[in-house]
Amino acid sequence: MEQFQHISVTDAQEKLNQKDHNARMVDIRDPQSFGRGHVDGAFHLTNDTIVTLMNEVEFEQPVLVMCYHGHSSQGAAQYLINQGYEEVYSVDGGFEGWNKAGLPVEK
């Protein structure tokens, strides 16, 4: 069985900036937290939006999963692997780590 990979917040930002990879960030935090701030261009992944994600993102595209601290994202990342996505990362440190690193946030 395929496994997701771990990625640091700085490596995640670098991967998102590599336009040739067409990586997508998905954020699984609650709607209020997502609304207060998220990574620029992040897709808010919920039970209600999973079908939309699967229609918009090819299985070959890298997918980075972010939660609050980097724990819940691991289960979601494995779920996406099980759905057929080939390159899935759990962002270590989550949104809190992203903020602490001073990386850009969209509000």
Curated annotation (Swiss-Prot):
It comes from the Bacteria. It catalyses: thiosulfate + hydrogen cyanide = thiocyanate + sulfite + 2 H(+); thiosulfate + [thioredoxin]-dithiol = [thioredoxin]-disulfide + hydrogen sulfide + sulfite + 2 H(+). GO terms for cellular component: cytoplasm. The keyword Cytoplasm applies. Its EC number is 2.8.1.1. It is an enzyme of class 2 (transferase). One of its GO terms (molecular function) is thiosulfate-cyanide sulfurtransferase activity. The active site is at C67 (cysteine persulfide intermediate). Pfam families: Rhodanese. It is found in: Cytoplasm. Its main location: cytoplasm. GO terms for biological process: glycerol metabolic process. Keywords: Cytoplasm, Transferase. Belongs to the GlpE family. Transferase that catalyzes the transfer of sulfur from thiosulfate to thiophilic acceptors such as cyanide or dithiols. May function in a CysM-independent thiosulfate assimilation pathway by catalyzing the conversion of thiosulfate to sulfite, which can then be used for L-cysteine biosynthesis. HAMAP family: Thiosulf_sulfurtr (MF_01009). This is Thiosulfate sulfurtransferase GlpE. It comes from Aliivibrio salmonicida (strain LFI1238).
